[in-house]
UniProtKB/Swiss-Prot annotation:
Source organism (scientific name): Arabidopsis thaliana (Mouse-ear cress)
PROSITE patterns assigned: ENTH
UniProt cross-references to InterPro entries, sorted A to Z: ANTH_dom (IPR011417), ANTH_N_plant (IPR048050), AP180-like (IPR045192), ENTH (IPR013809), ENTH_VHS (IPR008942)
GO BP terms: clathrin coat assembly; clathrin-dependent endocytosis
Recorded GO MF terms: phospholipid binding
Cellular compartments per GO CC: clathrin-coated pit; clathrin-coated vesicle; Golgi apparatus
Main localisation: membrane
Superkingdom of the source species: Eukaryota
Pfam families from the UniProt entry: ANTH
Official protein name in the record: Putative clathrin assembly protein At2g01920
Keywords: Coated pit, Cytoplasmic vesicle, Endocytosis, Golgi apparatus, Membrane
UniProt domain ENTH: residue ranges: 21-152
Compartment(s) of residence: Membrane, Clathrin-coated pit; Golgi apparatus; Cytoplasmic vesicle, Clathrin-coated vesicle
SUPFAM superfamilies: ENTH/VHS domain, GAT-like domain
Length: 312
C-alpha cells in the first residue's frame, strides 16, 4: 500500500510539473525554473539550475523576472519538495558569484508558516519544519548587505545571527534532497565564518595600525563579538558532529583554526580603556560593502586560513 501511495505521489507530481511546463510559454527560463524545482524528491536538477545561473550571468536584466518566476512557483505549491528546491535555487545564487543577489532584499514570498496546518507528526510534518527553518535563514541572509551604510562590526554581528539561524536547520533522516540541502547549509556556515574571521582580523589590524578610531560603543560591540564567538564555536562543533551522523559529507571539522594572537588580545583589552577617550572625536569608520568583506585580509592571510572558525 505504501509503495502504491509513493508511486501515485510521484505520478501526480510529474503531471503537475508537465501542466506547469505547458503553461510556461512566455520565457524559456520559466521552464528551466519549473524543471529545476520539480516534484522529484531525489535531488535538484543540476543541469537546469546551472542554466539559470549562467542565464543571469549573461543577462543581468533577467534576475528580477527569474526571481518572480521562482516566487510564483513557491506561491502555487504546498509540496515541501518544490518549496525546498526553490529555496535551494535561490540560496545557490549566493555561491554563484552573481553580485546582483546582494540587492534582493527580503525574499518576495513568505514560507514562515509553510505546512503549519498539518501536524508535525504527519507524513510531511518534519519536512515542513525543515522548509520553514531554511526559509527563516535565507530571508535573513538575503538582507545581509542590503544596508550599505553598516559599519564592519555591525555586519559581523549580523553574520553571527545568521550562523545561529543556520544551526536551527537540522537534517532529517537520510532523505537525499534534505542531505543535499544540508550540504548547502554547511557550505554557508563555512563561508560566513570565513567572512567573520577576515572581517574581525581586518578590524583589529586597522586598530593596531592606528588607521581606525573607535567609540566606546564600538569597543563594547567588539567585545560582544568575541564573547559570542566563544559560545558559538562550541555549538558549531556539536552541530557539525550531529550533521556528520546523518551523512552530510562536507560537515568536517576544520584542522587549521584562525586564532587571535597575544598582541591582538592586548589590543582588545585596551579598546575598553582607550575608546572612551576617543568618544569626543568623529569615528573614522568607512561603511563596508559586500565586496569589501570578502577581501579584508591580505592574500597571505587568506591562503593560511581558507575558511576556518574564529577562536580566542
Amino acid at each position: 500500500m505504501r509503495r502504491k501511495m509513493k508511486l501515485w505521489r510521484r505520478v501526480s507530481g510529474a503531471i503537475k510539473d508537465k501542466l506547469s511546463l505547458i503553461t510556461a510559454t512566455d520565457e524559456k527560463f520559466t521552464a528551466a525554473v519549473i524543471k529545476a524545482t520539480s516534484h522529484n524528491d531525489v535531488s535538484m536538477d543540476i543541469e537546469n539550475v546551472q542554466f539559470i545561473y549562467r542565464y543571469i550571468q549573461s543577462n543581468p536584466s533577467s534576475f528580477k523576472p527569474i526571481i518572480r518566476a521562482v516566487s510564483l512557483r513557491v506561491e502555487h505549491t504546498r509540496n515541501w519538495t518544490v518549496a525546498l528546491k526553490c529555496l535551494m535555487l535561490l540560496h545557490g545564487l549566493f555561491f554563484s558569484g552573481i553580485m546582483t543577489v546582494d540587492s534582493i532584499g527580503r525574499l518576495p514570498f513568505d514560507l514562515s508558516g509553510f505546512g503549519r496546518r498539518k501536524s508535525r507528526f504527519s507524513r510531511t510534518g518534519r519536512f515542513n519544519i525543515f522548509v520553514r527553518a531554511y526559509f527563516m535563514f535565507l530571508d535573513e541572509r538575503s538582507i545581509l548587505y542590503y544596508n550599505k551604510n553598516m559599519i564592519r562590526l555591525e555586519i559581523i554581528v549580523k553574520m553571527q545571527r545568521i550562523v545561529d539561524s543556520l544551526m536551527r536547520i537540522k537534517p532529517i533522516g537520510e532523505t537525499p534532497l534534505v542531505i543535499e540541502a544540508m550540504e548547502y547549509v554547511i557550505s554557508e556556515v563555512v563561508l560566513i565564518n570565513g567572512h567573520i574571521c577576515r572581517g574581525f582580523a581586518g578590524f583589529l589590524s586597522d586598530v593596531q595600525s592606528n588607521m581606525l578610531e573607535i567609540s566606546s560603543a564600538e569597543a563594547d560591540l567588539a567585545m560582544n563579538i568575541v564573547a559570542k564567538s566563544l559560545s558559538q564555536r562550541e555549538k558549531l562543533f556539536k552541530y557539525f558532529e550531529f550533521c556528520r551522523g546523518f551523512g552530510v559529507t562536507n560537515a568536517q571539522e576544520t584542522s587549521n583554526i584562525l586564532r587571535i594572537t597575544e598582541s591582538q588580545m592586548i589590543v582588545l583589552d585596551k579598546l575598553l580603556h582607550i575608546a572612551p577617550e576617543l568618544d569626543w572625536k568623529a569615528a573614522k569608520v568607512t561603511p563596508v560593502t559586500a565586496a569589501d568583506m570578502v577581501d579584508l585580509v591580505t592574500s597571505e592571510e587568506r591562503s593560511n586560513t581558507p575558511s576556518d572558525f574564529l577562536t580566542f
